[in-house]
Amino acid sequence: MNQEVMNLFNQQAQPQSFDQIKISISSPEKILSWSYGEIKKPETINYRTFKPERDGLFCARIFGPIKDYECLCGKYKRMKYKGVICEKCGVEVTLARVRRDRMGHIELAAPVAHIWFLKSLPSRIGLLLDMALKDLERILYFESYVVIEPGLTPLKERQLLSEEEYLRAQEEYGEDSFTAMIGAEAIRRILQDLNLEKIAADLRQEIATTTSDLKPKKLLKRLKIIEAFQMSGNRPEWMILTVVPVIPPDLRPLVPLDGGRFATSDLNDLYRRVINRNNRLKRLIELRAPDIIIRNEKRMLQEAVDALFDNGRRGRVITGANKRPLKSLADMLKGKQGRFRQNLLGKRVDYSGRSVIVVGPELKLHQCGLPKKMALELFKPFIYARLDAKGFSATVKQAKKLVEKEKPEVWDILDEVIREHPVMLNRAPTLHRLGIQAFEPKLIEGKAIQLHPLVCAAFNADFDGDQMAVHVPLSLEAQLEARVLMMSTNNILHPANGAPIIVPSQDIVLGLYYLSIVADGAPGEYKPNNPQNPMQGVYGDFGELEHALASRAVTLHSRIKWRWKGLGPDGEEISRTYDTTPGRVILSSVLPRHPKVPFDVVNKLMTKKEISAMIDIVYRHCGQKESVIFCDRIMGLGFSHAFKAGISFGKDDMVVPENKWSIVDETRALVKDYEQQYQDGLITQGEKYNKVVDAWAKCSDRLASEMMNRISSVQKDENGADKQVNSIYMMSHSGARGSPAQMKQLAAMRGLMAKPSGEIIESPIISNFKEGLDVLEYFNSTHGARKGLADTALKTANSGYLTRRLVDVAQDAVIREVDCGTENGIRMRAIIDAGQVVATLATRILGRATAEDLVAPDGTIIVPKGQMIEERHLEAISKAGIQEVKIRSVLVCATKNGVCATCYGRDLARGTPVNQGEAVGVIAAQSIGEPGTQLTMRTFHIGGAAQIADSSFIESSFEGTVRIRNRGLARNSDGDLVAIGRNVAVVIVGPDGTERAVHRLQYGARVRVDEGDQIKRGQRIAEWDPYTRPILTEVDGIVAYEDLIDGQSITETTDESTGIAKRVVIDWRGSARTADLRPAIAIHDQTGKVQKLPRGSDARALLPVDAIIGVDPGARVKAGDILARVSTESAKTRDITGGLPRVAELFEARRPKDAAIIAEKSGTISFGRDYKNKRRLTLTPHDGSEPVEYLIPKGKHIHLQDGDVVEIGDFIVDGNPAPHDILAIKGVEELAAYLVNEIQEVYRLQGVSINDKHIEVIVRQMLQKVEITDSGDSEILTGDQIDRTELQEINEQLIAEGKKPVQGVPVLLGITKASLQTRSFISAASFQETTRVLTEAAVNGKVDTLEGLKENVIVGSLIPAGTGAMIADIKSIARRRDDLIMAQKAAESGAALPELPAAE
């Protein structure tokens, strides 16, 4: 008896643990095996009794009882009848919960096609039968017959016949001589009769023998789907339904509202339509109705089932009573509101609350202020338990009463409960992992949450009404994780770049800056050999100094001598004397004592950068605990001194430069001059525009620097002592608030503005905000401001979507092992842009592992292979003058299903080597996505003031000797050296003979140095006109025009505003008559023959469309003179608006609009015959392989001449290179370098720092697939794309069997495509295109092994990262232990337990 009672309670089956999920097409038998009964009536529930109708959609006999352990008619009630089936109403007595998982079915009177397999592209049924979707639809929707068995008639198998043709054929050949059918029965019959083995063999044969290029692709597609059916055990005819499953009624509820109305799920409507039409069809068949009526009913049934599965995919959307489209089964899964994203990936959480945040400056870094009311509500169960344990209450009810009355003992207990129990604070939008952090709650009065000021940067929070949510970690494990991993004190460094993120900002910075200012002539300052008081301003003791400050004998800013006591390198006490100020001494008093933290750290002007560096030093040397205490202390110091200083500013603090109007007048004169040049026809409209904009930009910059000089200089009073520093300058210079750009607008001139289209308006705003704008200026400035606000709204969404795609593609990149042992690596060097070092080598290699020994020139090993490059190595590396380092990278990591710790390097958020199980992919995605949102939200800060970012010269950043590589220079008529070669480079060689910098020269640049010159830092190397691309002559001679026919290929345009003529090449391809002209300028010698260039081809320059010709026929020219010029587009404002789409474009690996054409081999260029309106260019490779042909649209400017030699990877036509071409031509390393640099460029422009390794992680995920070039001895087909790891596994097996391995080339996929092609179909389906992903997965019978993070979140298990990764290891150890115990039991030998094998 006892056992039975126990069984009663244990009957609820435990959820099965599983480690993979398979999806396939269900057969009619399978559907019937799930079903508990057939639904025959469309009725739902009786509107009077509210009881379900029998055999209806809510039938209790089929789906189970409505109340627990009670049958419908009430004959059997209570638990003792469990399992009894009532003979009166047929209901089983059990839990009502079974109505959530018992299914029903509808037997269809006629088969119908499953719309997903029919209409989800590519149509699976269509591919399988090799029929067009249009034809299939005509058969299915009863418009055409299809011949199934032609017999002896001349009809073909699968030929479509219209109604008339069918009748005619029957008359002609007799009714029984052939079989033709219509509707889904026909398709089902064809699918049933398919012989998959034979078709597959035929297709393989055809692929092997076909010669055309396009055919194999089509055949491959079909072969793939046929193989999928063979492998997965699905039968083709299952794509046609004969039975429709009905989902459990509690998943499509029907709830009575008051007033006799019902709220119902749309599915019930859709099911009712199916049942109604099905029943009507059954009746019509029984009544032997005319064929046409039955056919119509079958078509309607097909449409009803289509609407049930995927409403709106075919034909009109079916709407409900309120004209709203009904939500079908497919819609339940799809999109943001679908099952995947709404319920499985994002759930609402209990034990949470939200409130407004206010600042809590007296909190410690690990604390937050929690309102008592909130805490009482959130910790209720803990309080009840503690009240019970202490004997204050015997039952939960009593405890509840106590808490509701807020008795004093409740507050005491709340204090106990909350002690050491961290809570998590989250601020939406959570853009990176620092958007959720754990704090220890501190109970406060009031209703607002208090937040520590230093964590605001991580949350991106401010106190203008932001709200935050509080979550309580309940279990011990959760509390442990919150404390160890998420505590705010454990998140001092930014995961994106490793810099401290707990940095003081705003008031604190201002206070510290004020504290560290030095003022000359302040009272009590130390004067050397001061006869009156030689000891004035000399202090050795902190108390003495405080006393002097309090008695006003000395100010915070006076210069004093101070004896500092600290620790020497071995930890011994030392003392030194410093020239400093009392303010800096106060600041030094909070520094931790450590040999590596000397007084020099604070003995300087404390700007935000310096403070950040100081925190960094303290963190690296003194550890986390010291840094946290230190941060809290400097915060207090900063606040108190900002408060004491009382810094404020007034109108007069904005100093307008005195010479403002003289500079403006100068510029106006210059602009007038350009106007005149334009009137005289010396420059074009576009060039004038560019020059005017340039002039105003320069004027604006000059004014800004004048103003900065005025504001930053400290005035002296009559005694020669410093007056107060300008407040605005203090705020801006310290980094507390405001930027030079904003100060410029306040006090210099507002500057150039952009139109909404992004072009710059020629007339700038000359006034500043202090003087005030006039009406016209104000109007011009509204554009930029409005555009900024509109952009903000749009780009937040874009940036969020980019982050979502990044997370999706990288979610399964997890650290799986310590070292994969690969020998490969990538080479890193400093990035130099226009002669400026943009990213130093040190910043790029810090915290990465070396791929080979890093050896100094004298042979000493600085860093051995496989070791991490730390801060202490950097000095040695720069001393050794090393320019290039080979480091390990995730791009070359050989770990399967993840990456290894050595290839990844340092965990930036902790400053230590990365741990196993760290989800580096998600961190990378957040690090790249988070600033995207930040930046887009901040576009309007510059107020649209145009910033011209176009350099037109190179300056040397080093001293040294000039060497010129690939010398192609000539002296032109003006006596300037001009670069006439395409790859001329100026190399700066240091005194030790190492190359310090290499500058590639723009074609047509005027070179200011020559071979062997000594060059100083900052000296000009070359300059060029940024607005035009010149076409030069390479030899001296006489100009001759070729094919430049007036009105056909050249036109003299007279500028309407100037009356000046200029010759422009026009598009000559318009008419057939002129299509084969080749407009060019040739250089003749004295005899009138075309001269030869040194490499043997003719001296002839082909002209592109819109080239402006600058020489007359017959004119004498010297090498390096300009023959014609092509105007480049006007300078656009570079703003991250261009940036975010650019980042997305690079990650999506889209081909740019005007993609560059890259040379695939090194070789010689020759021009072939023109083809229609394209130029034919042939590259003959040096290695003797087949020549490569390129067809280039005629208007494009090709800067190569006949006979030019190009290197592999050189640009034949300029433009943005397509990433796929870089991968194919130069390989993975070059591609990665290109993507990393291009993406970094966008972020750098905005001053955002992201570590390269994050971008590398994403690029690795984009390169997961391989295209098969040679299938070796395997079953794989050439041209197929498979996973890299799959290829490795297949090859290992083939090599083991001594067969020929498969060859493949890496393929670059955009992030969206890569996410949709992950091995896990659950992850792909929850991302985008759910229908397509699931259809494909079902056809292939895919198995999801649940390896990534997303799949595991969806099925509700622990994610295989972080602590979850360890759980998996522990489980596998436990399993092995179980096996051993079982084996031992079986043996029953009584031997000792064998040694446990180590975890893999």
From Swiss-Prot:
Q: What is its EC number?
A: 2.7.7.6
Q: Which GO terms describe its cellular component?
A: DNA-directed RNA polymerase complex
Q: Which GO terms describe its molecular function?
A: DNA binding; DNA-directed RNA polymerase activity; magnesium ion binding; zinc ion binding
Which cysteines share a disulfide bond?
none
Q: Which Gene3D superfamilies match?
A: 1.10.132.30, 1.10.150.390, 1.10.1790.20, 1.10.40.90, 2.40.40.20, 2.40.50.100, RNA polymerase II, clamp domain, RNA polymerase Rpb1, domain 3
Q: How does it assemble?
A: The RNAP catalytic core consists of 2 alpha, 1 beta, 1 beta' and 1 omega subunit. When a sigma factor is associated with the core the holoenzyme is formed, which can initiate transcription.
Q: What PANTHER family does the record point to?
A: DNA-DIRECTED RNA POLYMERASE (PTHR19376), DNA-DIRECTED RNA POLYMERASE SUBUNIT BETA (PTHR19376:SF54)
Which protein is depicted?
Answer: DNA-directed RNA polymerase subunit beta'
**Which gene underlies this protein?**
rpoC
